Amino acid sequence: MGQARPAARRPHSPDPGAQPAPPRRRARALALLGALLAAAAAVAAARACALLADAQAAARQESALKVLGTDGLFLFSSLDTDQDMYISPEEFKPIAEKLTGSVPVANYEEEELPHDPSEETLTIEARFQPLLMETMTKSKDGFLGVSRLALSGLRNWTTAASPSAAFAARHFRPFLPPPGQELGQPWWIIPGELSVFTGYLSNNRFYPPPPKGKEVIIHRLLSMFHPRPFVKTRFAPQGTVACLTAISDSYYTVMFRIHAEFQLSEPPDFPFWFSPGQFTGHIILSKDATHIRDFRLFVPNHRSLNVDMEWLYGASETSNMEVDIGYVPQMELEAVGPSVPSVILDEDGNMIDSRLPSGEPLQFVFEEIKWHQELSWEEAARRLEVAMYPFKKVNYLPFTEAFDRARAEKKLVHSILLWGALDDQSCUGSGRTLRETVLESPPILTLLNESFISTWSLVKELEDLQTQQENPLHRQLAGLHLEKYSFPVEMMICLPNGTVVHHINANYFLDITSMKPEDMENNNVFSFSSSFEDPSTATYMQFLREGLRRGLPLLQP
């Protein structure tokens, strides 16, 4: 008799009457749930605190606005550096110093530039002629609409802050080149920190940050002109660049270019920025920086305009800003002679009087320096310019010279007409944007070098050229340009005889290149090209090529 088969095993299914999870697992689950709830509560509390803090800050801001008014709140905010709506003693310090007339010597100067009586001393004199107010564009209508208070810092700046100052020779050590630096190879004494991608520094400032390291000597030198120099400008390119122009066994000649600016106002006035186009100069110093043979620093004054000025008319960074340009005849620092020992010793090491019995000072005799390598001032200036402005890899000729060259080489002229100099810090607005973007783009540089003669000009200079009677051709060239010009910057493609075959205003150009690609395709004048990722480069390339298309058939064979 056979045995019965066991019943088939059924799949396991949950049993409503099953035992609860073991105590350890349940405790872990409860702990995890508690942690999640605590985290959520913390996030909610943080958000609530942030909202409360924002609400309190907004309430304090609104209350301050009612009490102080717009201008008063602007002054308060300029001192409230941490934006907590309270003025600490440290934040109030600038006002206290202004009211009491007591400005203590900054600690950085005591630490970085200590006096050593055994070293040589260089005496430097400052020469300063104030800005000619009649060169400002707003002078044409008698400064209509411009508050006299806004220009008070400019009008009151009539002399150098320090007509003369003494420096220890070794304080100029930052001008020494890095080891192995070759003749004409630029290096940065103070590197810039800004680019077209980083934007610019705040306009709403009165006092420069304490200089550090190599900035100290630049700050001290510029302080001879005005007590509030900023060794780094708000806009790129910033800093100080230098190159060797001569080398001997014991000496270097170093040429340098400095981009710096000054804040002419203090509270309760609004900020007023004074930005010279550039400071340039040279120094001849021993290779150990113990002796300075010569030093000179100056703002170039060969153009009709050389200073940009910008001032605020409101209580925030986004307040209305006025912009103008003008001419300063002289801003110059120059050594009165080579550096000389502070203490004079005889052959036995005894200190002797620095004056003869007759009262005349002792005359020092310096050996002649024999240079082994030299570079011209013009070539050194060009290399420093390219270091600051990569768009100058294209050679931009003077206005009339460009048309002479175009006739000789049978090329078109790429011309830019604007108010401020394209290759220094007196340029502003759309001109500044152009030089930092499309004009330094490699494809644009290549096409300009291959197919065009380039030039840029100040509107003021062409207006002056148009009134000259000596050269009718130059008058005609200037007139043809000014006919096509629209404020603030006009780019033109011209025949060698000055005829403008194509042109575009910079503001319009920047507007259309900020469009979306699909909007560019619908534009009747320019369209986005897939050959370049950057629409600005693509559009400027199309502008140049359209100029070639129109102009090349018209060139004289």
Swiss-Prot record:
Origin superkingdom: Eukaryota
Keyword Nuclease applies: no
Localization annotation: Endoplasmic reticulum membrane
Chief site of localization: endoplasmic reticulum
Region listing for Disordered, in residue ranges: 1-24
Biological process, per Gene Ontology: ATP metabolic process; calcium ion homeostasis; calcium ion import; calcium ion transport; cell redox homeostasis; cellular response to caffeine; cellular response to oxidative stress; collagen fibril organization
Record has Ion transport as a keyword: no
Recorded phenotype for the gene knockout or disruption: Mutant mice show only subtle alterations in the muscle morphology, ultrastructure and contractility. They display increased muscle stress-sensitivity to physical exercise when performed under stress conditions such as a forced swimming test. Under these conditions, they develop muscle atrophy, predominantly affecting trunk muscles and leading to severe kyphosis. The number of satellite cells in uninjured adult muscle is reduced.
Any one GO CC term of the record: endoplasmic reticulum
Record text about domains: The N-terminus (first 61 amino acids) contains an endoplasmic reticulum addressing and retention targeting signal.
Function: Plays an important role in cell protection against oxidative stress and in the regulation of redox-related calcium homeostasis. Regulates the calcium level of the ER by protecting the calcium pump ATP2A2 against the oxidoreductase ERO1A-mediated oxidative damage. Within the ER, ERO1A activity increases the concentration of H(2)O(2), which attacks the luminal thiols in ATP2A2 and thus leads to cysteinyl sulfenic acid formation (-SOH) and SEPN1 reduces the SOH back to free thiol (-SH), thus restoring ATP2A2 activity.
Subunit description: Interacts with RYR1, RYR2 and RYR3.
Protein name: Selenoprotein N
Organism: Mus musculus
